[in-house]
A protein has these predicted regions:
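Sec-dependent signal peptide hydrophobic core
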Residues: 17-25
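C-terminal motif of bacterial Sec signal peptides marking the signal peptidase cleavage site
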Residues: 29-32
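Residue-level recognition of alpha-helix boundary/capping or hinge positions
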Residues: 3, 111, 120, 177, ...
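Residue-level signal for secondary-structure boundary elements
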Residues: 25, 68, 72, 418-422
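C-terminal "post-core" interaction segments
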Residues: 217-218, 223, 228-230, 239-451
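Flexible, low-complexity junctional segments that flank or bridge functional domains
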Residues: 34-232, 237-239, 245, 252-255, ...
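N-terminal secretory signal peptides that target proteins for export/translocation
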Residues: 1-15
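Small side chains
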Residues: 25-26, 203
Length: 451
């Protein structure tokens, strides 16, 4: 087999791998394993006797040296300690530029499971003495029936949800709700609606995760059949997911002048770039928008074209990865109005690297993505056109409520038929509750996943 044939075979295999599992930072079958978990002391002792760490760490180095985007920042192979555990070893190879690569258990060791969520998602806060959580949205029908709603302040104790209010002396309980099952599944489309605003039909969809595109198909079909004029896409609680699903949604939304054009182009390290060039004549890879079939194709290939001229996207500082890729990929072809908070800032992607012999699989950053104009997402995130905070002090009306602050801005702009970019929506349209000052968020919200 010639060098060119071998290169072509490798590119085909890489593309097969990427088409099935490439996501913006994770694989959805892993939902509870810590990326920092290491072997027990007994397992470490046994592994060192068998030389498992040395062998696996050398495998880790070889894979990273081939696929890692910042491979030139890795330490020299002769300077590495191959006797350390694989997770620690993997971390020792990462570039200072890298905030996203991680390792996790290989599915050959832990098996697979459906991606699940709890009955509600929340953000924790503290003033240094009092800790509480604010409900962001509720997915459990049982908890909704029991009265739990967005904006509630809660504390969790022994599978009980304590509802309360903040007083001068801290959190004061007012009611108790028995907890729901911690493993209730939910569709990734949290809510979809159509509003009649003046003479326009305005679609709204709150989308939680770029997972199975089947969750989107019926909603997009409904929007297509109703011939919506505008779309408000709520991605403020969406940390990312599959690139294929991101393309599917973007392709449905985009105006017809984007059909056949570049959805995404990706750059790689020097080794992968050379292999792609030898196989295809280009160091980059390209992914294109296709022409929608509007339900007339084979089952499973349905793509409904909404052919919109603009889209309103609601964001938070935790709108990341695939959420950002959707925004940046649409910008060359239509008006994208971003409302909320500046996004997370992840313009890179990865694929999983595994070997069934070893306990851990790798999820290193392997590429940088760009839109058709070679624009990408910087580490600062995507700036907003209308700033509205989504933190503790902002009124938490139900998602989809036309008076909910971020949605209200979008609907008001549609009514006005005039956009003033770079505005500060807080000064005129956003309601704030009177709350105690001095509370700070604890960590990331519960819906966050490392994609």
């Amino acid at each position: 087999m010639s060098l060119k044939q071998r290169a072509m075979l490798r590119i085909v295999l890489i593309r097969m791998l990427k088409s099935s599992i490439l996501i913006f930072g994770s694989i959805l079958v892993f939902n509870s394993c810590s990326s920092d978990e290491v072997l027990s002391l007994d397992e470490q002792h046994e592994s060192k006797i068998l030389g498992a760490y040395d062998e696996e760490c050398r495998w880790v180095y070889a894979q990273m040296n081939h696929d890692y985007l910042w491979r030139k920042d890795m330490p020299d192979s002769l300077a590495c300690d191959y006797t350390t555990d694989p997770v620690t070893f993997f971390k020792s190879l990462l570039s200072s530029k890298d905030k996203f690569s991680y390792s996790t258990h290989n599915s050959s060791y832990v098996g697979t499971s459906d991606f699940v969520k709890y009955g509600f998602e929340y953000q924790e806060y503290t003033d240094g003495n009092t800790n509480f959580a604010q409900v962001l949205y509720v997915t459990s029908p049982k908890l909704k029936e029991r009265g739990l709603k967005r904006g509630d302040l809660v504390q969790l104790h022994d599978n009980k949800i304590i509802l309360g209010v903040l007083c001068s002396n801290g959190f004061e309980s007012r009611d108790t709700i028995e907890g729901s099952s911690p493993f209730e599944q939910t569709t990734t489309v949290y809510l979809d609606s159509i509003y009649q605003i003046e003479r326009k039909k305005v679609g709204y969809m709150c989308y939680l995760q770029f997972n199975n595109k089947k969750d989107l198909t019926n909603v997009l079909k409904h929007f297509y059949e109703e011939q919506i004029d505008e779309l408000v896409l709520d991605l403020r609680y969406n940390p990312g997911g599959l690139v294929s699903t991101c393309k599917y949604l973007s392709n449905s939304v985009i105006s017809e002048n984007g059909y056949g054009e570049i959805f995404q182009q990706c750059t790689y390290n020097d080794i992968l770039s050379r292999e792609y060039f030898e196989a295809t004549g280009s160091e980059k890879t390209f992914n294109h928008f296709r022409i929608p079939n509007n339900g007339k194709g084979l089952p499973g290939s349905e793509l409904y074209g909404l052919n919109l001229k603009r889209i309103f996207v609601l964001t938070s500082k935790y709108s990341a990865s695939a959420s950002e890729a959707l925004i940046i990929s649409l910008k060359p072809f239509m008006s994208v109005v971003v409302i909320g908070e500046q996004t997370y800032g992840k313009g890179v992607g990865s694929w999983a690297i595994r070997n069934n012999k070893y306990k851990y699989q790798l999820q290193p950053i392997t590429m940088q993505y760009y839109n058709a104009k070679m624009e990408t997402v910087t580490t600062d995130g995507i700036p907003v056109d209308y700033y509205v905070p989504d933190g503790y002090s902002t009124t938490k009306r139900n998602l989809g409520d036309v008076e909910e602050p971020l949605l209200k801005i979008a609907l008001d702009l549609i009514k006005m038929e005039k956009l003033v970019m770079g505005g500060n929506a807080c000064s005129r349209s956003v309601a704030f509750e009177e709350q105690n000052e001095g509370f700070k968020a604890i960590g990331k919200p519960s819906f966050w996943r490392d994609y």
